[in-house]
């Protein structure tokens, strides 16, 4: 075996000896190039391996950081959820009376000791429930201060009351009726009486809402007094002792003439605004 290797080596040496100097130089050059290529491949493979290991390490670190962050945030939320500060401690309402406050709390469905996580994401729905269920609320702003829920209310004008049995319900300028009643009226608002149809009641309330406040506050009672000719006929009892006959659909416009007509009448009487406008004293 060793003899064969020696013979091969001797043969290669003899072959080299038979080459010209230029050919030997070319052969050496090719051998050097081949060695450099092999070395370059080794370096490239080694470099790629280092890059792959580095990329793998960075991905692993990123995954560990992500998981740690998720677990950390979950732990903080879980801890916060069991603390008293995460629950509603109080409910404050600004811009309305005690009766409407009760209605707002009921409509909001927000309760003391309820989790704030149930309140914050549903603020829009709470606002819509209040506006839909509480007739006097025109708009409501909901905010949180620490763990106190605050409602800042903007209301429609109150234009009067409707009596049902022994309970009085507020009527608003948009023609709606508050669903929470009270045992007595308050404020200088007229009482709506004898209205059998809610559509006429709400239309009358809207008309009163369009009147100047000075005229509106001069009305004591508004009676539905329909006839076959005019189902929208109403009779108004004024605080100054006069009576006004009118029609719901033109009430706001024609009542603007009332102050000057009452002054021209000179004594207590009836001002008829149903068709045209004229007045006569009671003793006529």
Swiss-Prot record:
Q: Please tell me whether the keyword Protein biosynthesis is annotated for this protein.
A: no
Which keywords fit this entry according to its UniProt record?
Answer: Cell cycle, Cell division, Cell membrane, Membrane, Transmembrane, Transmembrane helix
Tell me the membrane topology, using the record's own terms. Answer: Single-pass type II membrane protein
* Main subcellular location: membrane
Locate the POTRA domain: which residues? 86-156
Q: Which InterPro entries match?
A: Cell_div_FtsQ/DivIB_C, DivIB, FtsQ_DivIB, POTRA
Q: Which Gene3D superfamilies match?
A: 3.40.50.10960
Q: Name one GO cellular component term.
A: cell division site
Q: What top-level branch of life does the organism fall under? A: Bacteria
Question: Extracellular compartment: which residues?
Answer: 85-284
> What biological-process terms (Gene Ontology) are attached?
FtsZ-dependent cytokinesis
Subcellular localization: Cell membrane
* Topology feature Cytoplasmic, residues: 1-63
Q: Where is this region: Disordered?
A: 1-21
* PROSITE patterns assigned: POTRA (PS51779)
Q: Which residues cross the membrane?
A: 64-84
**Free-text function comment from the UniProt entry:** Cell division protein that may be involved in stabilizing or promoting the assembly of the division complex.
HAMAP family in UniProt: DivIB
Q: Which family does it belong to?
A: Belongs to the FtsQ/DivIB family. DivIB subfamily.
Q: What is this protein called?
A: Cell division protein DivIB
Which source organism?
A: Ligilactobacillus salivarius (strain CECT 5713)
What's the gene? divIB
